């Protein structure tokens, strides 16, 4: 019997009560009975939470799990994703014995092919991450590829990457096994029990409505796959995912032994092949997918679309050319079924910003089987502990902008997202569709100035100004933007540059309770004189870093809070929750306020040319702000700088920003003024060791291990959020952050590279870039607390080679901070 794509699976096989009405209350309700929901249920039970009910609208696995190909991999492109995937690979090997269900786990390995040198570079980086995480992986040559895959025509192949421990599992039976194991531990499973609504009281979830009655619960998990977006939207929660057609086809009998063949990924031709009995399964990740709105998906379980051979014709031809046996065997089954994809092709999980107690685990981008055990384990721990127990920044549901859940936006992005799984994963890659949706007030000026525009969370921003075009600039070794970014970097270090920082998340906290709100929300002491600012962290209740930024007291009862662009959605809701019970209002100023960063040793001179105010150090000291006249209007100038140079952040009404920029441009012409993009800013901030939210710090990091203890005021009259959790930690930090610079200026760092001492891994980079003033690639690295950063045996691994590096506890550029203080 062909057990793949089995539509007969049901919880009734182990839970006779699966057809009963749900219980009136539970500790946790999980919406969705696919492999993600089943994994969360099982891992919650393992954590001791068994008062759980899984509500499935049809039967188990009938959403998208049933038609998955079941690929299992131990390594992904980052340490976080590898941690999730590696646990899954280990778990599937034990699931059959654990559950009593034959889940069909087979581990013949996997083989990824490179048909061009750039792809070989990408595979080499992936091998490095795998090595660091303890996943066996080997770059292989053509002779080794022939031995691993005798049916493969090696023409056009330049290299391969072999993971001996990878394989595949039967996805439907794996989900059934997880659900059965969860049920054995006390979890309830209900089929034909569609969740139709979510109850909210005072910003917190209190239960759900189903087609068979209501369930009261303080925690609800939305694990409904492609239907999750619409269900979340019922209560105003943004979950940006969208469906697309996803195809795999099964060949006829091959006529040769195929059972021991590794999973084959011919990523340059957008397909994978894995054995299935005496046949081969061919799956497609075509460059241009076919998005499908939920309304197009057939009602009921096990939905499919009409087979569409013409759409995958190029992929079929490429596969038959590479594996000629497919031509003789032909194909006898075509499955075209829905799968969901996200704007950045990374899964979504975590607690929502808008509703406390409402969690999401969805948008797996056709990798749900790979991630299900890891997602289940980590979300269960998150629910039990109240905060993530791993570096969740890249997968957190709160990382998106709300507009990215717009269906038109998602429809266009999903055309691209499906193919991105097998496309080149260039450093700094920018999505191509849809673009120009969310713009700063200066967007058109940037375009006219020849900016290469990128995006962050859907916000357009300049990466650099002038040639080359973005599409021609991608490279792992020396990107095309290297020289132009270097010139912009030098402009800030030696003269003066302007950076559009309008994307900063900006909030006003005002009212009689504003000070109390921020003293609780911020780690620093914000009881400041008027027009003074402080750098601070915003922690969760367990001491993890939700965001960092500045707080400026602009009046006795009014504060300006500025945090990174990516934190806007998270910070709005965090501040609102922290202000509950206080006489304070939180207002999002982001869209209505532009910010121009004027940075460099000649920034004071430039500002004095466009403003009659006194810009001396005495009149405008470091971390001070004030209202100023500038150009033909007024602005608020804050003397802070993320570049390590003297500088000012100029905050003005959005409709004045062009006037301010034009005045600066005219006045600074003879000073060599340049517009500066975000890639130069990244290089500048790394030379100073400034942390970047989402890469260097996040909810799993505490201030001490992140090297940011200076931003914590331990002796405030009222403890700040997370303070008690930090103080109760029995042990000091096990890791710390160091600065790393390569000796060889020709080798490029991007982040995720392994740091070693005498060849033994001791940590990895969280950020990397070229430091133009330092003269080589630099980065921030998390290493063991006992690692001596000045050890002369320090090295960083790049594409399998350990390159000599120097380390430091302090930044390589102006470690005393004299230049930024002016």
Predicted segments, located by residue:
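Conserved, structured C-terminal
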Residues: 425-453, 461-463, 473, 480, ...
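Extreme N-terminal leader/targeting segments of oxidoreductases
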Residues: 1-28, 46-50
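Glycine-rich FAD pyrophosphate-binding loop
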Residues: 45-65
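Flavin (FAD/FMN) cofactor-binding and adjacent substrate-gating region
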Residues: 2-8, 91-94, 98, 106, ...
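C-terminal catalytic lobe of FAD-dependent flavoproteins
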Residues: 171, 268, 306, 310-434
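Dinucleotide-binding Rossmann-like beta1-alpha1 core, especially the glycine-rich loop
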Residues: 70-148, 268-273, 277, 299, ...
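Active-site substrate-recognition segment that forms the wall
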Residues: 43-46, 70-72, 94, 101-109, ...
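Acidic, proline/glycine-enriched N-terminal capping motif
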Residues: 4, 9-10, 399-539, 544
């Amino acid at each position: 019997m062909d057990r793949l794509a089995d539509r007969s699976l049901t919880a009734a096989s182990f839970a006779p009560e699966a057809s009963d009405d749900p219980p009136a209350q539970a500790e946790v309700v999980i919406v969705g009975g696919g492999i993600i929901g089943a994994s969360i249920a099982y891992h919650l039970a393992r954590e001791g939470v068994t008062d759980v009910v899984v509500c499935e609208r049809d039967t188990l696995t009938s959403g998208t799990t049933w038609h998955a190909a079941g690929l299992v991999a131990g390594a992904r492109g980052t340490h976080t994703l590898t941690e999730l995937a590696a646990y899954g690979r280990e778990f599937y090997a034990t699931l059959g014995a654990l559950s009593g269900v034959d889940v069909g786990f087979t581990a013949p390995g996997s083989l990824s092919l490179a048909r061009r040198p750039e792809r070989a570079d990408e595979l080499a980086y992936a091998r490095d991450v795998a090595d660091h995480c303890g996943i066996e992986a080997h770059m292989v040559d053509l002779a080794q590829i022939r031995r691993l895959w005798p049916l493969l025509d090696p023409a056009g192949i330049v290299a391969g990457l072999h993971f001996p421990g990878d394989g595949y599992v039967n996805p439907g039976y794996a989900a059934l096994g997880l659900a059965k194991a969860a049920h054995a531990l006390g979890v309830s499973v209900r089929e034909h029990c569609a969740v139709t609504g979510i109850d909210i009281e005072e910003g917190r979830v209190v239960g759900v409505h189903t087609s068979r009655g209501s369930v009261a619960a303080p925690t609800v998990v939305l694990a409904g796959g492609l239907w999750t977006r619409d269900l979340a939207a019922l209560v105003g929660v943004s979950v940006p995912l969208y469906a697309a057609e996803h195809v795999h086809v099964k060949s006829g009998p091959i006529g040769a032994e195929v059972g021991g063949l590794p999973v084959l990924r011919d990523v340059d031709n957008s397909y994978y092949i894995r054995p299935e009995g005496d046949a081969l399964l061919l799956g497609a990740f075509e460059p241009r997918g076919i998005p499908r709105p939920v309304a197009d998906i057939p009602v009921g379980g096990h939905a499919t679309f009409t087979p569409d051979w013409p759409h995958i014709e190029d992929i079929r031809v490429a596969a038959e050319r590479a594996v000629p046996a497919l031509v003789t065997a032909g194909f006898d089954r075509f499955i075209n079924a829905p799968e969901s994809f996200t704007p950045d092709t990374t899964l979504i999980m975590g607690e929502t910003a808008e509703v406390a107690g409402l969690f999401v685990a969805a948008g797996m981008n056709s990798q749900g089987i790979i991630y299900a055990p890891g997602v289940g384990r980590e979300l269960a721990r998150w629910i039990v502990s109240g905060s993530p127990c791993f570096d969740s920044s890249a997968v957190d549901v709160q990382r998106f902008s709300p507009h990215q859940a717009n269906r038109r936006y998602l429809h266009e992005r999903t055309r691209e997202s499906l193919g991105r799984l097998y496309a080149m994963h260039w450093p700094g890659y920018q999505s191509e569709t849809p673009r120009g949706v969310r713009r700063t007030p200066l967007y058109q000026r940037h375009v006219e100035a020849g900016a290469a525009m990128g995006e962050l969370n859907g916000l357009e921003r300049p990466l650099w100004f002038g040639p080359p075009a973005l599409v021609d600039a991608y490279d792992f070794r020396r990107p095309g933007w290297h020289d132009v970014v270097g010139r912009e970097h030098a402009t800030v270090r030696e003269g003066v540059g302007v950076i559009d920082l309008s994307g900063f998340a900006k909030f006003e906290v005002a009212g009689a309770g504003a000070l109390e709100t921020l003293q609780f929300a911020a780690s620093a002491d914000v009881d400041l004189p008027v027009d003074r600012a402080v750098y601070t962290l915003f922690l969760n209740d367990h001491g993890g870093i939700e965001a960092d930024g500045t707080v400026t007291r602009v009046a006795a009862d009014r504060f300006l809070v500025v945090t990174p662009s990516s934190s806007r959605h998270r910070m709005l809701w965090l501040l609102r929750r922290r202000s509950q019970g206080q006489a304070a209002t939180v207002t999002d100023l982001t869209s209505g306020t532009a910010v121009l960063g004027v940075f460099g040793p000649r920034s004071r001179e430039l500002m004095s040319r466009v403003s009659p105010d006194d810009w001396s150090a005495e009149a405008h000291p470091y971390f001070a702000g004030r209202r100023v006249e500038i150009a033909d209007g007024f602005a608020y100038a804050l003397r802070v700088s993320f570049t390590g140079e003297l500088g000012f952040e100029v905050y003005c009404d959005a409709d004045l920003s062009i006037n301010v920029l034009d005045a600066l441009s005219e006045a600074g012409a003879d000073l060599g003024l340049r517009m500066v993009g975000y890639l130069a800013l990244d290089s500048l901030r790394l030379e100073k060791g400034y942390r970047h939210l989402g890469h260097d710090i996040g909810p799993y990091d505490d201030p001490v291990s992140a090297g940011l203890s200076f931003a914590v005021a331990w002796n405030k009259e009222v403890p700040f959020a997370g303070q008690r959790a930090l103080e109760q930690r029995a042990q000091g930090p096990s890791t710390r952050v160091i600065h790393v610079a390569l000796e060889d200026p020709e080798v490029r760092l991007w982040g995720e590279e392994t740091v070693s001492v005498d060849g033994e891994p001791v940590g990895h980079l969280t950020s990397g870039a070229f430091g133009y003033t330092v003269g080589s690639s630099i980065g921030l690295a998390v290493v063991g607390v006992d690692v001596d950063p000045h050890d002369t045996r320090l090295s960083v691994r790049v594409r399998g080679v350990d390159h000599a590096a120097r380390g430091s506890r302090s930044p390589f550029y102006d470690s005393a901070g004299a230049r930024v203080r002016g």
